Amino acid sequence: QTNSNKIRECIEQGIPPDRIACVSFTRKAAKESRERVCRDWGIDERDMPYFQTLHSMAFRAGGYSSDEVIGPAEMREIGEAVGIPFGNKGRSDIETDFDTVGVSKGDFYMSQYHLSRSKGLSLEEMHRQLGDYSIDWSELKRLVSAYEDYKGVRKKIDFTDMISNFVRSADGPDIDALFVDEAQDLSTLQWSMVDVLRKKPRIQV
């Protein structure tokens, strides 16, 4: 049985759409779930606040503004300060920290840092596991330190921070049913967020 059939059953049982969460990894999957329910049931998207990506849910739960989220321009500024180049990516369509990463040296280094955080590993352990000797360990540490300092001073956050903060708060929305889409794509950290979401609903898929 597909998630959409199970969601249909929940609605038929009388569970209000705003008490059903369907979370996913990508915006595309979240949008498809929302549109399917809207089309089948004539429900307004605004009445389905929890059909969204995990990052969107963490963003909204934390009450953040888009100005607080670190983006490519800030990454270039950090790169200039430490002498490590970053690419010229724009801000559009960014929905994970990996989306801010391009193909330059700084981007390549940051992808290793984001990967370590998403897997719940130390940077050193991640570096050791990947065994990529094209990466200068001292340079990587210097960049990560500058990145975290910048966020602290400028009061900025990234997508991983949002999910980490959500997990730390251990307080999910008041819902009756939880559906997890694209489960195979979720990281260790994202599964920790799903564990928080699982605390209240009686129906879980």
PLM regions and their residue ranges:
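Short, well-ordered alpha-helical microsegments
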Residues: 30-31, 187-189
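P-loop NTPase Walker
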Residues: 1-68
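A short acidic, amphipathic alpha-helical/loop segment
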Residues: 6, 36, 190-197
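Accessory N-terminal region flanking or inserted into the helicase ATPase core
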Residues: 1, 19-21, 93-179, 188-193, ...
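Walker B catalytic acidic pair
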Residues: 182
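Conserved phosphoryl-transfer catalytic core
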Residues: 71-97, 201-205
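A short helix->loop->beta-strand "cap" motif at the edges of active sites that frequently abuts
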Residues: 46-47, 199-203
